[in-house]
Amino acid sequence: IYKALVRVGNLAYLSGHGPCLDGVTYRTGRVGLDLTLEEGQQAAREVGLSLLATMKRELGSLDRVNRLIKTLALVNCTDDFTQQPLVVNGFSNLFAEVFGPDHGVGARSALASNTFPGNIPVEIEIILELKD
């Protein structure tokens, strides 16, 4: 049981999202085994699209967002895969396109894991600053 987005003052905390929209998973698999680096980047971009859809639904408009503060990204990958930051660039590039290089880029962590619910390749949670 959880909420997709929780507001505290002018901050919005978004729960972890996968490359899913309307209950449909776009992509599954582990990067470095089932997916290439490029496919992992596309999966991270798809996670970004899912987050944008949640933001629009919960906030009413993306215009309510002032900036991205923090991204925590987890990449489902093999033990020897070490390019998690490059995978997560698929997400980061999308948010930079949507919100600009100043407001769409924040602090970021890109970590590895080797198992995810539904075998999704990437899960991302974010913290946003909202406009007054």
Features from the language model and the residues they span:
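Short, polar/acidic, helix-capping and beta-turn segments at strand->helix junctions
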Residues: 1-132
